[in-house]
Amino acid sequence: MRCVPVFVILLLLIASVPSVDAQLKTKDDMPLASSHANVKRTLQILRNKRCCITFESCCEFDLK
């Protein structure tokens, strides 16, 4: 019966160890853009292309 508490403690310690996916960031790591930002950017490009075909004066390629 003495082994049961030791076994439980070992299980708790193993569960609290960070997984392989938890890696430290380096200075070269860039945060990934969210899917919302990607959709917004794509819609902006398509809107500008459609606008340029119809009215050349409204052509803007100002992507932020």
Swiss-Prot record:
One of its GO terms (molecular function) is toxin activity. It comes from the Eukaryota. The keyword Secreted applies. Coiled coil: none annotated. InterPro entries: T-conotoxin (IPR031565). Residues 20-48 form a propeptide. One of its GO terms (cellular component) is extracellular region. Contains 2 disulfide bonds that can be either 'C1-C3, C2-C4' or 'C1-C4, C2-C3', since these disulfide connectivities have been observed for conotoxins with cysteine framework V (for examples, see AC P0DQQ7 and AC P81755). The modification 4-carboxyglutamate is found at residues 56, 60. Expressed by the venom duct. Keywords: Cleavage on pair of basic residues, Disulfide bond, Gamma-carboxyglutamic acid, Secreted, Signal, Toxin. Residues 1-19 form the signal peptide. The keyword Nucleus does not apply. The cysteine framework is V (CC-CC). Belongs to the conotoxin T superfamily. This is Conotoxin mr5.3.
